Amino acid sequence: GLLDVVGNVLHSLGL
């Protein structure tokens, strides 16, 4: 879902 995408982006940014 959208939240899954957001979580993946944050993880990619190292947050």
UniProtKB/Swiss-Prot annotation:
What is one GO biological process annotated to this record? defense response
Its keywords, alphabetically, are:
Amidation, Amphibian defense peptide, Secreted
Q: What are its GO cellular component terms?
A: extracellular region
Instruction: Describe the task this protein carries out.
Output: Caeridins show neither neuropeptide activity nor antibiotic activity.
Task: Write down the superkingdom of origin.
Answer: Eukaryota
Q: What is this protein called?
A: Caeridin-4
* Lineage of origin: Eukaryota, Metazoa, Chordata, Craniata, Vertebrata
- The signal sequence is none
Leucine amide occurs at L15
> Tissue specificity, please?
Expressed by the skin parotoid and/or rostral glands.
Q: What is the scientific name of the source organism?
A: Ranoidea caerulea (Green tree frog)
Membrane-spanning parts: none
Where it sits in the cell: the answer is: Secreted
- Coarse class of the primary localization is secreted
